[in-house]
Curated annotation (Swiss-Prot):
Site (Important for substrate specificity): 192
Domain of life, source organism: Bacteria
Family statement drawn from the similarity comment of this UniProt entry: Belongs to the MetA family.
Name assigned to this protein: Homoserine O-acetyltransferase
Recorded name of the encoding gene: metAA
Length: 305
């Protein structure tokens, strides 16, 4: 089954070209089926790139997905055209009376700030509380996951002395988890962050279960059944060249930056990077969508009750 996207959204042509099944809302309305309603609260500066990354993973599942783009109500983005935001995004205050089968809260390049110093923190707290009554399952990604685990459990993020940057080996520490169905025991995940979560502090928080972890990069994926949520601190959704773009940007700006670890062949930035995480990215998000499908009520109004 396809993902439903407006025909004018850039992701529509991108995913169609890649062979992902995409359909317009008009065509979807003629099908006698209830699609899963998945929201993307997009906090990243490069909105279109992030839309494409998550739509690609969500759209690869065998279920029809109604993909809704959501923004913070008052925050004004500086890196995406206002026309794009107006055409495709809805402010949270407009959707907060609606029900969603799933919600993804993305990362944001604001790790250096205390949570309370983020300009939209109060509304984001409202969003996170709202998920408990209006969303069947929520997926917090990188800073979004750190914000959620702090909001619900007061587990703090910690500043790193050097940026965790590259593709790091991770272990499957919960092979019986339905979210890890089909996962290998050992695999790589892109990492790009200045902060970390600490395993001992996660272990001390009641109700949390670590599913993926790395000796080098620390805890990665945490399940929070009590809040119907997953928190991932790394970036399965990244394109093959996302780390390259970040590295090239910092080099061009004269910022100190290490070559991303285990990313380029022979750690040589002149060589094209290899994508070694794509299959596990599709597994994780496909398993998440399947778990939503198995658990969400047929009547959306029953979500959260």
């Amino acid at each position: 089954m396809p993902i439903t996207l407006p025909a004018t959204l850039p992701a529509f042509d991108v995913l169609t070209h890649e062979g992902v099944m995409v359909m317009t809302p008009e065509r979807a309305a003629r099908q006698d089926i209830r699609p899963l309603r998945i929201g993307l609260l997009n906090l990243m500066p490069k909105k279109i790139q992030t839309e494409n990354q998550f739509a690609r993973l969500i759209g690869a599942t065998p279920l029809q997905i109604d993909f809704q783009l959501i923004r913070m109500t008052e925050h004004q983005t500086k890196n995406t055209a206002a026309e794009h935001m107006e055409a495709f995004y809805r402010p949270f205050q407009e959707v907060k009376h609606e029900k969603f089968d799933g919600l993804i809260i993305t990362g944001a390049p604001i790790e250096h700030l205390d949570f309370a110093d983020v300009t939209y923190w109060d509304e984001l707290c409202e969003v996170m509380d709202w998920t408990q009554t209006n969303v069947q399952s929520t997926f917090g990604v990188c800073w979004g996951g750190m914000a959620m685990i702090y909001h619900f459990h007061r587990v703090q993020k910690h500043r790193l002395q050097a940026k965790a940057f590259g593709c790091f080996r991770h272990r499957n520490v919960a092979p019986t988890s339905p979210y890890l169905r089909g996962f290998s025991d050992d695999f790589v995940i892109p990492v790009s962050r200045w902060t970390e979560m600490r395993q001992a502090e996660i272990d001390a928080a009641p109700g949390l279960r670590t599913l993926l972890a790395s000796d080098e990069a620390g805890p990665c994926l945490v399940e929070d059944p009590g809040h119907r949520a997953l928190y991932i601190f790394n970036h399965f959704e990244y394109d093959s060249d996302t780390l390259k773009q970040e590295y090239d940007r910092d080099v061009a700006n004269g910022k100190p930056i290490n070559v991303p670890a285990n990313y380029y062949p022979d750690d040589d930035p002149s060589k094209p990077p290899l994508n070694r995480w794509r299959s596990h990215a599709h597994l994780l998000y496909g398993n998440w969508i399947n778990e939503i499908y198995q658990s969400t009520p047929y009547d959306p109004q029953q979500i959260g009750r």
